[in-house]
Amino acid sequence: MFFAESVKIALSNLLLHKLRTSLTMLGMIFGVAAVLSMLSIGAGAGREALSLIQKMGLRNVLIRAKAFEEEELRIIRQDSPGLTRHDVQALGQVLPAGTRIHAKKEHKTYQIASALGRADSRILGVGAGYPLAANLEVVEGSFFLPTDGLKRHQVCVLGKTARRKLFGLNPALGEPVKIDALWFIVVGVLADQLLEKDEFEGVKIESVNNDIYIPLETLLAKYERKPVENELDEIIVQLPQDQDLSEQAAVISGMVASTHRNIDDFSIVVPERLLEQSRQTQRIFNLVMGAIASISLLVGGIGIMNIMLASVLERTNEIGLRRAVGARRRDIGRQFLLEALAISLSGAALGVLLGSSISSAVSTYAGWPTTITGVSVLLAVGVSASVGLVFGIYPARKASRVSPIEALRYE
């Protein structure tokens, strides 16, 4: 019996009992849908986590000033000066060669305007090397230079949203922007940065689109701040590739704690650790979802085996007749195995459609990122086919061992 003919007969037999076949496929449909949904959610979450962490910097250690009420700050300032440029200098003396340290300070302002518009942006004072640490891309002009900070130049770089609010479709480079009482000249515009989330593993991540960057030295020299306010809001330590992040994070924490007299007024964030925590959470999620999907596939496999055993019993006369006219045992076994495989693959195809719909719904309504890849589809279909083969072997062997004489006498 040719293989193509066996496939044709298998499909014909299944179509004779449409309802029974459909009910048998349900377990495979839900199992494959669960597997595909799990893989798509896992892939989407992994992609999003990596994207967010890359924006924070995989080789960075972040030192952030903690937020307190003003009265609490007054008490804390009796012992700790908060984050200052002295911390930057102290870290530079103990950290390995090749380490880059960048400081950041936000200026609270309510007056940002150009001749064409207004903006409600954050004003951030940073050094000239900050784009390397924060993965910022300049698409118009350039970032300001180290000399701009040293000479306290009043220059600025705009985020994409800030540029649109202040200048619309008009040119921005070389144009003045008023920040409180001071005028700054625009020297650059940043690329649009899309963030699907503003928080990751409890750590806040800010989009740069509405930010305006000015030299840190200019900000500290020309804008007043409250006596209890931190001189710096954040210090980014960019470590060389050959350094252990956990080990250096401990050194950084110890050094800053000593300059702050062991006052807990700062936090240490290691993006690489956050990525590992996210992956660990995702592994647990995949394990739970995998167990649920396995149960559904197991039920589907048992359903296939039951229906195929019933089919063997129902078609005993047919088996005997085929054996009598020359069909071999392996032809009979292959016939029933193909029917089991056809049920599982049909269920897999419908399961892929259902799983894709579930993934799309999760992305739309729950806001979770999902990614369906060719590998995940092949894996889901492969698992389904394997289940069909495994649970179809016993009925196929039983059918192939039916005695032709007994089969023809069976009623």
Describe the residue ranges of each PLM region.
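Short cytosolic juxtamembrane segments of multi-pass membrane proteins
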Residues: F2-E5, L14, A396-E411
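Transmembrane helix-loop junction
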Residues: R47, R164-K165, S356, S360, ...
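Mid-to-C-terminal secondary-structure elements
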Residues: G129-F144, Q154-N262
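Hydrophobic, regular-secondary-structure patches
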Residues: A43-R122, G129-L132, T147, R164-K165, ...
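Transmembrane alpha-helical interface segments in multi-pass membrane proteins
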Residues: S6-L11, L15, L19-F30, M38-S40, ...
